[in-house]
Every structure is written in structure tokens, then in C-alpha cells.
Amino acid sequence: MNTEKVAFDIISLAGDAKAELQKALKLAREGKFSETDALLEKASEQLQQAHKLQTQELLTREANGEKLQFNVLISHAQDYLMTTYTLEDVAVEIISLYRLIKK
């Protein structure tokens, strides 16, 4: 797979995960925790897929001696993936707080 396709796939998966996390936060605020949990799981799966792409298609190839062309698109994909991972961490904590408040 070429690096441009990998970058777009990572961005797409991370973007979908981010949208699911934002929905999960909204539903948690409303006390709809079963729906929230399903969205958190879906987001986690999307992030795992993006991470797998990053590892198999970029990092492993580079580690095996292939010289990948660096470009802004790859940088954006990496950044978007990592910021979405951060959002996931924060969302899980905020949702835990909503669970306590809604008891």
C-alpha cells in the first residue's frame, strides 16, 4: 500500500473514532451509559485498526530498511491518530465522572 493511501486510511479511521468519542461524551452527559459503552468500544476498535496500519505499513517498512518519503500528509495522519488517542483517554475519565454524578 502506498504511503498516501495509508495516511488517508489512518486519518479516516481516527476521524471516525473521534466522532464516536464525541457522541459517547454527549450520551454520557445524558446518562445513556449502555449506548456510551458501545461507542467507546467502536472507537477503540477503529483506533486499533489505525494503529495497526501505522505499525505494519509505515513503521515496519521503515525498520526493514525501506526509505519512506516523508510528507505533510503522513505527519497529519500521525498527529490526528495521537490526538484521538488522547481524546479517548480523556473521554474515558470524563465518562467515569458522569457515571459517579448520575448515581
Predicted segments, located by residue:
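Terminal alpha-helical segments
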Residues: M1-K103
